[in-house]
């Protein structure tokens, strides 16, 4: 893989990780301070940003929608089992 492609991949992964952290913060703010309209708006914003990054990961051939759907099914089954 050449440096330019690797640099784009690195940037995509860095931004994805940053967005995941922002989603974590939005969730923990609700847990710490309670639910209100502003916090739900922030949560929706961060979920949307994360969804955008997932779509970009797919567009850059790092995974497929099918890969994600398979993993989603596995996670849902685990949650059913342990919830």
What do the PLM-derived regions correspond to, one by one?
Residues 1-47, 51-83:
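Flexible "arm" and connector segments at domain edges
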């Amino acid at each position: 893989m050449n440096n330019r492609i690797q640099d784009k991949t690195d940037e995509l992964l860095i931004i994805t990780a940053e967005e995941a952290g922002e989603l974590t913060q939005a969730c923990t703010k609700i847990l710490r301070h309670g639910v209100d309209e502003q916090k739900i708006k922030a949560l929706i914003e961060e979920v949307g940003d994360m969804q955008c990054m997932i779509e970009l990961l797919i567009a850059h051939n790092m995974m497929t929608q099918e890969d994600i759907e398979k993993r989603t099914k596995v996670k849902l089954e685990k949650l059913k089992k342990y919830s």
